[in-house]
Each structure stands twice: as C-alpha cells, then as structure tokens.
Swiss-Prot record:
Note: A single active site specifically recognizes both ATP and CTP and is responsible for their addition.
Pfam families per record: PolyA_pol (PF01743), PolyA_pol_RNAbd (PF12627), tRNA_NucTran2_2 (PF13735)
Full protein name: CCA-adding enzyme
Positions that bind Mg(2+): D45, D47
Subunit and partners: Homodimer.
Lineage of producing organism: Bacteria, Bacillati, Bacillota, Bacilli, Lactobacillales
Function noted in UniProt: Catalyzes the addition and repair of the essential 3'-terminal CCA sequence in tRNAs without using a nucleic acid template. Adds these three nucleotides in the order of C, C, and A to the tRNA nucleotide-73, using CTP and ATP as substrates and producing inorganic pyrophosphate. tRNA 3'-terminal CCA addition is required both for tRNA processing and repair. Also involved in tRNA surveillance by mediating tandem CCA addition to generate a CCACCA at the 3' terminus of unstable tRNAs. While stable tRNAs receive only 3'-terminal CCA, unstable tRNAs are marked with CCACCA and rapidly degraded.
Residues noted as binding ATP in the record, renumbered to the chain: G32, R35, R116, D159, R162, R165, R168
Alphabetized GO MF terms: ATP binding; CCA tRNA nucleotidyltransferase activity; magnesium ion binding; tRNA binding
Length: 402
C-alpha cells in the first residue's frame, strides 16, 4: 500500500532517512506515527528505525545525543528537529515482565517489527510513502481490530504493560480487541502486579483521557485487569456504574477531573491516600481531593462566595462539568457572578497584614493574631468589609472591644 502523500511531519524528517540511505543503510519511519497517518489522525513523535548500528548512525550525522545507545537509540538533531533513530534489533528473554535481559542489533527490518506489541503498531513507512506491513496490520486497521503481533501470550508475558497499552489503544482508537489477544490479556492480567505503579498510572491516565474511555473501562472490567492495579479491587458493579453515570459522548478535560470522577464512582473514602499509592504529586492529590469535595457538597447546596474564594472559579467549573455529564443541575453563571463580586482572590491582596496590626494595635504573634487575620479575610470575602486600611483597622478595633 502507498499513502497518497507523505504527511508534513515525515517530510520534515525525510533528510534523516535520505542521509542514512545514502550511507548504504536501510531506514524507515515506524511505530504509532505511521498508524496515525493511515488513520488520518494527528501525528506526534516521528520515530525512525535503521539497519545502521548506533556508532554508524553517529558517524552519518554531525549532531547526535546518546539517549539510549545500549538499546540502539540515538537522538539525531537535523533540519531543526529531533529524531530518535533506533537500530533494528531483537530482544532476549524478558526480566521482571517488562524489560529484555539484552538486545541484539540486526540488519533485518522484519526481525525488528516482530518485537512490536500490536499489528497496527508494526508498520514501517519508506521515503516513497510505501507502507511495509509484515503482519496484516492494514487488514486489522480496516476492521478496527487490535491484535497482538505473533503469539499474544508471548507478547504479554514479555511485557505485561502491553495489557494496559492494549486497553488504552482500544479507548483511543475505538478498536475492538481480537479474541485471542483478549484471552491472553485476561489470562496474563495478574502480571500487572509486577509493573511499576508509575507506568501503570501513565497508561490508565491516557485511557481515561481518550475519546472512547468507556470502551477502555469496559475492557478493563472484562479482562479483570483492574483487580491487579493498586487499590482498584472494587466490585464489577461499581465499575459498571462509573461507565453508566456519564453521558455517552462525555470526555474528561484534565487528568485531575478524570481521576476525581473515578474515585467518586468507586466511592473511595480517602482519595489522598489512594493517590499516594499511585505515586502522584502532592499538587495532583490536592486538586483531585478538591474536585471530589466540590462535587460532594454540590449534591447538598449551592456554591458560595467562600467556595469561589477557596477553590477558585476554574476548579468549580471543572467539577460542575462532571455534574452536567451526569445530567445534574449546573450553575456556571452563579460561579462567574460570585467570582466577579469577590473583593480579593488571595489573602495576600488584603491591604493590612499582621505586621501592621502588631505595630499599630499591639498584637503579639500567636493564636489571637491568627484569628483576627482570618476574621478580616472572611469578612472581606463575604462582602461585609471593604479592603481598605481605614475600614479594616476600625473592624479590628471593634473586635477588640467585644
């Protein structure tokens, strides 16, 4: 098969291919970028595979960086871009169900493509826009099927993370998982316990943000892979409710929103503790926790000025979007209106600080000063006190007389 044209992302990288070929080696575009070109999807990273060994690649180009030379990868800086050029290779026995014990460089493209995970990721593309398809990936692409390259059991036993990648591809591409591939994913799902939490997080996060995330969750449920992810041992009913709760075409707008929705559906009592186990950042944990808090109090009451001040309008709107996707009442206008009424959005905007109160009104550092500053802040947020020095000092004087 031949593409009708070579997309601009490949055209920009074409000089790299041409230089490698001029030096007497083979070179092709490979991986997800070729798949995405065939599906008319946006192309991101352009990867190149070559029969040239790393040292040979480095001799061809003036500017290179060793970014994974032990695995055959050299970063080539050419034509204003950065391109990973990886030597054709085969892989030895895998250790820890994730990494090969060693790699061997080879001169055969087919040997290199054999080690890929799925047939739709095992294409190569030459400089003439001709697609090399050794494993009937084009047929799978036409039929929207996700199929492992070769024996599925071997692929997942080599690298258990491919199970999560498969679920993610089903969600991002809207592909059905081929029967034998699905069976192998199910029978090898227990190996996910061997995979680092950080890598599992990346794949599950991409699944949640995919356009067809519901398909990915359904496959996660069907393969029972969720049972081998940290703290995801909920019942099938809770996972099914997660899918059912949201409108069919709803897409999450951020990772934080997606994880908040997940934890709400699964009824986790301690989101911060859960997210720590997934080794997420403190800021990520705080944002997810805040979204969950907002969603829960919105089931009981309206948004207040204090809510807008504490959480910020953007986070409130993000939580409101989850309500909208669940067909619940929303009030974006109220959030915007209250935000417009706020005299301050941060306590540092208050014109009187603790130093001034100590200097002019005799306050000492301690709980009394802290309570007074908090009272000032709350009164300004509630619109009961103007944010000017005269009003604030009078407010404090009145407090002291009570």
């Amino acid at each position: 098969m031949k593409l009708s044209y070579l997309p601009s992302e490949f055209q920009k990288a074409l000089p790299v291919l041409e230089k490698i070929k001029a030096a007497g080696f083979e070179a092709y575009f490979v991986g997800g970028s070729v798949r995405d070109a065939l599906l008319n999807r946006p192309i991101h990273d352009v990867d190149i595979a070559s029969s040239s060994y790393p040292e040979e690649t480095k001799q061809i180009f003036e500017r290179t960086v060793d970014i994974g030379i032990e695995h055959g990868t050299v970063l080539v800086l050419e034509n204003g871009g950065e391109y990973e050029v990886t030597t054709f290779r085969t892989e030895d026995v895998y250790v820890d169900y994730r990494r090969p014990s060693s790699v061997s460089f080879v001169r055969s493209l087919e040997e290199d493509l054999k080690r890929r995970d799925f047939t739709v990721n095992a294409f190569a593309l030459n400089e003439n826009a001709e697609v090399i398809d050794k494993f009937n990936g084009l047929a799978d692409l036409d039929n929207r099927v996700l199929r492992a390259v070769g024996k599925a059991e071997e692929r997942f036993n080599e690298d258990a993370l491919r199970i999560m990648r498969g679920l993610r591809f089903a969600a991002s591409l809207d592909f059905d998982i081929e029967e034998k591939t699905f069976e192998a994913m199910t029978s090898h799902a227990f190996l996910l316990e061997k995979i680092s939490i950080e890598r599992s997080f990346i794949e599950f996060d991409k699944l949640l943000l995919a356009p067809h995330w519901k398909k990915g969750i359904k496959a996660l449920l069907a393969t029972k892979a969720y049972q081998y992810l940290p703290d995801f041992q909920e019942t099938a009913e809770e996972w099914q409710s997660f899918v059912a709760d949201y409108a069919e075409d709803f897409r999450f707008t951020s990772s934080e929103q997606a994880w908040a929705a997940t934890l709400l559906a699964l009824k986790h009592d301690n989101p911060r503790s859960f997210l720590k186990k997934w080794k997420t950042s403190v800021n990520f944990q705080k944002t997810v926790q805040s979204l969950i808090e907002i969603f829960r109090f919105r089931m009981e009451r309206e948004v207040t000025k204090q809510d807008v001040y504490h959480y910020g309008k953007d986070l409130l709107k993000e939580a409101e979007t989850l309500r909208q996707a669940q067909r619940l009442d929303v009030d974006y206008e109220r959030i915007a209106e209250l935000d417009g009424q706020l005299l301050i959005h941060d306590k540092h905007e208050i014109v009187v600080n603790g130093g001034k109160l100590m200097k002019e009104l005799g306050f000492k550092p301690g709980p009394d000063l802290g309570r007074t500053l908090k009272a000032i802040e709350n009164a300004i947020v509630d619109g009961k006190l103007a944010n000017d020095e005269e009003s604030i000092m009078a407010f404090v004087q009145a407090m002291k007389q009570v």
